[in-house]
């Protein structure tokens, strides 16, 4: 009789789930690109924090929510495009985090630097992350300590962070501030690249960039998928005080993150 390895069985179950999440991210991305390439008028409104939201955000969100509800109906979902009673969410140990269109500003600028972000949180830790950049047709994924990159439905390859003699520092294209400006003035040895959305995390994870500093506020759906991918690729994501970004809702007062940095060092 063939012996069944319990851990291999569990691992295979999670790998199959990851594959489904990757397919779901692609489906949302294809919807985004259909609207990106169309001549249809895109309705834009603004949230209280003055960030834009469009019909495209909602369309992608509906695809992801429906898909996640079929894949794992027992796991609740937190999406950027929904409203939640935070006190109820505080009791969730496991939940999905979704940003259906990360980089709406980049989408509206037509520069291609926008992504679909999906991650799974278990007891405050992002254990699974998927980032799909539909304009470039590149997908990044991670589960625990393994991270991969797949281009244009090609072969999936493992990725790892990499150090460099002349580190590349990647920063937000649309969120400059005075603290970042002062920081960059002190970092003379680094090359600097501006990039939109969670692609900054991906550049760290694949070894192209080495440092991603963020001083302004973000939300947990902005960072969780990228966090999972960087950690799985051997990097780190920490607050400026040296702590870990924590996604445990019971220890938070809101969905907002303070500043952090991701790095290969």
From Swiss-Prot:
Q: Where in the cell is it found?
A: Cell inner membrane
**Pfam families (UniProt xref):** Inositol_P
- Listed GO MF terms: 3'(2'),5'-bisphosphate nucleotidase activity; magnesium ion binding
Q: Where does substrate bind?
A: 80, 101-104, 222
Quote the PROSITE patterns the UniProt record gives: IMP_1 (PS00629), IMP_2 (PS00630)
Residues that bind Mg(2+) 2 = 99, 102, 222
Catalysis performed (reactions): adenosine 3',5'-bisphosphate + H2O = AMP + phosphate
Keyword list (alphabetical) reads: Cell inner membrane, Cell membrane, Hydrolase, Magnesium, Membrane, Metal-binding
Q: How does it sit in the membrane?
A: Peripheral membrane protein
Q: What is its EC number?
A: 3.1.3.7
Enzyme class of the recorded protein, top EC level: hydrolase
Name the needed cofactors.
Mg(2+)
- Where along this sequence does the record place binding of Mg(2+) 1? 80, 99, 101
GO BP, sorted A to Z: 3'-phosphoadenosine 5'-phosphosulfate metabolic process; phosphatidylinositol phosphate biosynthetic process; sulfate assimilation
Domain of life of the organism in this record?
Answer: Bacteria
Role according to the record:
Converts adenosine-3',5'-bisphosphate (PAP) to AMP.
What family is reported?
Belongs to the inositol monophosphatase superfamily. CysQ family.
What is this protein called in UniProt?
3'(2'),5'-bisphosphate nucleotidase CysQ
